[in-house]
């Protein structure tokens, strides 16, 4: 939408300066292979479908009532699955909303918050939106986070682990180094992709009062369409998030989303099975692309980050699109020769590989 300067006179001055986040493309094209937004290729647990149907058909009358503002049953399900106390759980309308509350609750400090120069692109958006001071820390030449860079004075730290879009993960020992170096600042570990092979920092919660772990049901639990995210931390940090939430939107999660998420957390066997399928498919996709001449960064996510020395990444993305396959291309410094490719089913990955081999490379 184009808005004229004259029309912008109604806008707040700060809004005129915003550079909003650009979501991944959601095209409505038949027979399209969509490997650009890291959605799970498999459906949610059948128990999720049953739970949603129960709300719709057996509890329809309650839809006239507001949902539980605390989403208590969901917090209980998360606490049980993570083996923590319910007072250590915060829930929100997707992890993006949870992250927004985190920025408001903890990062309006005198010093700058630290995050990598190549990371989730919502961080600079939130920083601008809330007026947070920031300092971007360059990844090393191998696109890895050097935790020693996060020991300098700051107003807080946020790290995606595994990182996005690079897919590379830190160890728990490295995360502990960051926590120990910043005892008076909040350290946020954004674990949107942690269930695909990385180590979760949730196990460190009771040892570090400055740690917040943020997760989502969108990736590993196939619930991107329902928007349920959560944070785990000691109760004094959760209290700050609740204060922000109840100053913004007291009812962030609807009844369908609560029921679906609870059912997902209660079906651990299905969750683990689907995660392993993605991991196995990822490993084969890496092998296949490597044979085609791609250099693929070591991935612990449900996507890979790959470059080809003989082919321009932007042109590859365009040629794939012409063949009905969409991947994510970032026209940004340092990564403009990489493609981020979501791991699909074995059949979807095979279509990608065959298209590259027969029609493009």
Swiss-Prot record:
Organism of derivation: Acinetobacter baumannii (strain AYE)
Catalyzed reactions per annotation: L-histidinol phosphate + 2-oxoglutarate = 3-(imidazol-4-yl)-2-oxopropyl phosphate + L-glutamate
Signal recorded as keyword: no
Annotated PANTHER family: HISTIDINOL-PHOSPHATE AMINOTRANSFERASE, HISTIDINOL-PHOSPHATE AMINOTRANSFERASE 2
N6-(pyridoxal phosphate)lysine modifications at: 219
Cofactor(s) it depends on: pyridoxal 5'-phosphate
Pathway it works in: Amino-acid biosynthesis; L-histidine biosynthesis; L-histidine from 5-phospho-alpha-D-ribose 1-diphosphate: step 7/9
GO molecular function, one term: pyridoxal phosphate binding
Subunit structure: Homodimer.
Gene it is expressed from: hisC
Family: Belongs to the class-II pyridoxal-phosphate-dependent aminotransferase family. Histidinol-phosphate aminotransferase subfamily.
Source organism, top-level taxon: Bacteria
EC number: 2.6.1.9
The keyword Transmembrane helix is assigned to this record: no
Gene3D superfamilies noted in UniProt: Aspartate Aminotransferase, domain 1 (3.90.1150.10), Type I PLP-dependent aspartate aminotransferase-like (Major domain) (3.40.640.10)
Any Pfam family the entry gives: Aminotran_1_2
Lineage: Bacteria, Pseudomonadati, Pseudomonadota, Gammaproteobacteria, Moraxellales
Name by which UniProt lists this protein: Histidinol-phosphate aminotransferase
Keywords linked to the UniProt accession: Amino-acid biosynthesis, Aminotransferase, Histidine biosynthesis, Pyridoxal phosphate, Transferase
GO biological process, one term: L-histidine biosynthetic process
Top enzyme class: transferase
């Amino acid at each position: 939408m184009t808005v004229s300067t004259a029309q912008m006179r109604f806008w707040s001055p700060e809004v005129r300066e915003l550079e909003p986040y650009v979501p991944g493309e959601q095209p409505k094209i038949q027979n399209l292979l969509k490997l650009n937004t890291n959605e799970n290729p498999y459906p949610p647990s059948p128990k999720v479908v049953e739970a949603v149907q129960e709300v719709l058909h057996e509890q329809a009358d309650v839809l006239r009532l507001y949902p539980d503002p605390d989403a208590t049953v969901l917090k209980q399900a998360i606490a049980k699955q993570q083996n923590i106390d319910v007072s250590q759980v915060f829930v929100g309308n997707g992890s993006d909303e949870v992250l927004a509350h985190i920025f408001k609750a903890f990062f309006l400090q005198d010093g700058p918050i630290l995050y990598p120069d190549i990371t989730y692109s919502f961080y600079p958006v939130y920083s601008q939106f809330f007026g947070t001071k920031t300092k971007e820390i360059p990844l090393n030449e191998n696109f890895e986070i050097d935790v020693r860079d996060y020991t300098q004075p700051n107003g807080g730290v946020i790290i995606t682990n595994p990182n996005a879009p690079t897919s590379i993960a830190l160890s728990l020992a490295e995360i502990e180094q960051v926590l120990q170096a910043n005892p008076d600042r909040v350290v946020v570990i954004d674990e949107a992709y942690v269930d695909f092979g990385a180590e979760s920092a949730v196990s460190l919660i009771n040892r570090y009062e400055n740690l917040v772990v943020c997760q989502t049901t969108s990736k590993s639990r196939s619930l991107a369409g329902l928007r349920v995210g959560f944070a785990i931390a000691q109760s004094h940090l959760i209290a700050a998030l609740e204060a922000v939430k109840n100053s913004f939107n007291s009812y962030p999660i609807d009844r369908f989303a609560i029921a679906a998420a609870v059912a997902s957390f209660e079906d651990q066997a299905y969750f683990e099975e689907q995660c392993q399928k993605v991991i196995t498919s990822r490993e084969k996709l890496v092998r296949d692309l490597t044979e085609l001449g791609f250099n693929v960064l070591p991935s612990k996510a449900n996507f890979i980050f790959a470059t080809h020395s003989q082919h321009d990444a932007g042109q590859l993305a365009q040629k794939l699109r012409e063949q009905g396959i969409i991947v994510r291309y970032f026209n940004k410094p340092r990564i403009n020769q990489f493609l981020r490719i979501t791991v699909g089913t074995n059949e979807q990955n095979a279509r990608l590989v065959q298209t590259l081999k027969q029609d493009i490379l």
